[in-house]
A protein has these predicted regions:
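Short glycine/proline- and aromatic-enriched beta-strand/turn motifs that initiate or cap beta-hairpins
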Residues: 22-61, 254-270, 297
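Short loop/turn motifs that connect adjacent beta-strands in outer-membrane beta-barrel proteins
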Residues: 21-24, 65, 113-120, 183-185, ...
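Gram-negative (and chloroplast) outer-membrane scaffold detector with strong preference
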Residues: 65-148
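Outer-membrane beta-barrel transmembrane domain signature
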Residues: 128-253
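Residues that define the transmembrane beta-barrel architecture of outer-membrane proteins
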Residues: 48-52, 99-103, 119, 168-172, ...
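Outer-membrane beta-barrel proteins
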Residues: 36-42, 78-83, 131-137, 187, ...
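Residues on the lipid-exposed face of transmembrane beta-strands in outer-membrane beta-barrel proteins
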Residues: 29-31, 56-60, 105-109, 125-127, ...
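Extracellular loop and loop/strand-boundary signature of outer-membrane beta-barrel proteins
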Residues: 39-45, 88-96, 158-164, 245-248
């Protein structure tokens, strides 16, 4: 994911510096909270299961109200049934954690002209490519990656309706935020961004429980142990039937970020390439309101 985006970013910066010289270019960092919504967590506002996200970005303004952003986010997502308020889901006793890397490209529309007004709300939307790999911890505290265990017998000839899922997918990011231009060169902001994915396996949970004996022969004892973990809470809890609901495939998983952003404009910053000077941005931009004169009588 990162290699692909870096190639295109470097290509744009070094092949087209003259085309960008009259436009405003910001670079920055971001950090905040990451969340997930899916079969293990239906509530998008659960702060107790939030995790961290950090990122870097570049933002180009071809027009005062319109900008194009590209960047990378590095996050962690996760959830556990033990925090669920529903008794039947707590009894399921599943959990997962996943590191998530994302590269994205979005289009942002500001409500106000950033060259005239220091503070402006905005909305954005775009496309992203992300990689994840869910894991959990067994009863001995050992970290176990779930994809290779095929906990729902993905890929088994006995379950053709359960195909293996991919660890690299695309999503549709969208959301909004607010930006405050502290000076001509520095901006800070807050953003809430949702990611609509097209997979139901961020949490490794999607459909029904596979037959216990079939799963044992296909994937081994460790897969059986981590497919159903209710017996860890109640030793007399039986393994569910092959028609038992483990997840809901009708609803895809989501992830989203709530971040604070810090940006620096490259206006007035020049560098040499092949003996020529290049620069980015409008060095004469001023972030000030128009003066309003008092009426005369």
């Amino acid at each position: 994911v990162i290699k692909v985006y870096l190639r295109y970013s470097i290509l744009v910066l070094f092949l087209f510096p003259n085309a960008l010289s009259s436009q405003e270019l910001f670079i920055g960092i971001s950090g905040g909270l990451s969340n997930y919504q899916g079969d293990l967590l239906n509530n998008i506002s659960t702060l107790s299961q939030s995790r961290a996200v950090g990122g870097m970005y570049a933002q180009l303004y071809p027009f005062p109200y319109l900008s194009i952003s590209g960047g990378f986010n590095f996050a962690k997502i996760g959830a556990a049934d033990k925090f669920n308020v529903q008794p039947d889901l707590r009894a399921r006793n599943l959990s997962f954690v996943s590191n998530l890397q994302e590269g994205y490209l979005t289009l942002q529309i500001d409500f106000f002209n950033y060259e005239r007004i220091k503070i402006t709300p905005y909305i954005f939307g775009g496309v992203a490519l992300f990689h994840y790999n869910p894991y959990t911890y067994d009863t001995g505290g050992e970290k176990v990656f779930l994809h290779s265990l095929t906990t729902e017998a993905q890929g088994s000839p006995d379950y053709p309706e359960h195909p293996p899922y991919k660890l690299t997918n695309y999503s549709l990011p969208f959301g909004g935020g607010i930006t405050y231009h502290v000076t001509q060169l520095i901006s800070v902001g807050a953003q809430l961004g949702f990611r609509k994915t097209f997979t139901d396996y961020l949490d490794d949970v999607s459909t029904t429980y596979p037959d216990q004996e079939t799963l044992l022969q296909y994937a081994g004892q460790k897969s059986v142990e981590l497919t159903f973990r209710g017996d860890e809470l109640n030793s007399s809890a039986p393994y569910p039937s092959s028609t038992g609901v483990r997840g809901d495939p009708n609803y895809k998983d989501w992830y989203y970020f709530t971040v604070i952003k810090l940006g620096v404009s490259l206006s007035g910053i020049h560098f040499k390439t092949g003996g020529k000077n290049f620069g980015y941005g409008n060095t004469q931009r001023k972030l000030s309101k128009k003066k309003i004169s008092c009426p005369k009588f």
